[in-house]
Amino acid sequence: MKKTRINFIWLIGLLAVFLTTTGFVQSNIEDNAHILNKETKTLINEKNNRYLQTKEQPQIVVITVKKLNKLTPKTLDHSKRTVFIVGGQKGSKRNVQFFSTKDLHGAFTADARANILRAEVDQLRSQNNAKFNQGLRFVFRACATKVDQQYQYALDKYDLTSSEQNKISHPHSVALPIALALAFLIMGIVYVLKKFGHRNSEPHN
C-alpha cells in the first residue's frame, strides 16, 4: 500500500514537471457552438503556428459557446500573452467579445477593443454563417496585428492591411463626410423654403 502511494505521488510530480516544462499551451480552437468554418480554423491555426516559432510565443484563442452573456474565459487570469476571442450564440442571436491577459492590456485598450468590434458589427451579428465567419476572421486578424505590433514582429499576410487598420483607427472617418453632406443639404432646403416663403408673403400688385 505504501509503495503504491509513493508511486502515485511520483507520477503526480512527474506530470507537474511535464506541464511546467511544456508550458501546457491551450488549444487554439474550442468550437463548442459548431459555427467556425474551415477558412476561419485554418487562419487561427496557421497564425498561432507562427507564434510558436517566436521567443514570446503569444497565442490567440478562439472559443465559441452556446450563450450570449458571461463570456469571460475561466483561464484568463491564469494565462499569459494570450488573447481570447469568444463568440456566443443562442438561437438566432450572436455576440462576440474578446479579452486579453494583463501583459497585453496596453495593446488592447477599451477604445481599441470597441473600435475593432464596431468595424465589423453587422457581420458579427449576422445569422448568415459565412458573413459571421468573415467578421470573426477580421477580429482575429485585428488582434494578430495588435499582438505583432506589441512584440515588434514583422507583419505578415495574416495581419490587417493598411486600409483595414485605418478603418479601425478612424471609425468615424467614413461617417463624417456623409454627416457634413447631410448638414449642407438640410441648410440648402431651409434656405430655399425661407426664400420661397418670403416671396409668397410679399404683397401682389
Sequence positions of predicted segments:
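Hydrophobic secretory-pathway targeting helix
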Residues: M1-N28
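Folded, non-transmembrane soluble domains that reside on the lumenal/extracytoplasmic side of membranes
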Residues: F24-P171
